[in-house]
Amino acid sequence: MRGVRGGEEVEWVAELKAAVMRRDLERLGRYDHHRARQRVRDSFGGEHSRVIEAGGRPVGSLTVRPGAGGGLTLEHFYLDPAHQGRGIGTRVLEGVLAAADAEGAEVRLTVLRGSAARGLYERYGFIVEDQDEVDVHMVRAVRAGAAGPGGS
């Protein structure tokens, strides 16, 4: 992973988000071409955002921000569908969780209702904190030991 290299990469991430989330957003009746991209433009980049690379090329993104009470918030975690199913996202998530555990920080994230990603997060100890008709807000408590499924 590496830092963001300017506005063109932010636009690339905005397009990636729209492609990755379109099916779920349409299913929920929430897809809007402009809005799907604007949130990334408004909040991706800076010191907390990263571009995920494979073979020296960008394949995904994530942002890990300081959150309330010393915790962390995981946002903009998208992986190009052509690179999904290869363990890249799992390795990135494991790295984020290991760092969070080392800091003694819980991790929060939001996933769309019905998203396949929810299963991955649940395997890594995230539980539902709150939800509405569109979003499921999840949290993972600090764990001692490994960040893999089931903990130490």
Language-model segments: residues:
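Conserved beta-strand-loop-alpha-helix junction that forms the acyl-donor binding cleft
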Residues: 67, 84, 108-118, 131-143
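Conserved beta-strand in the GNAT
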Residues: 57-66, 73-78
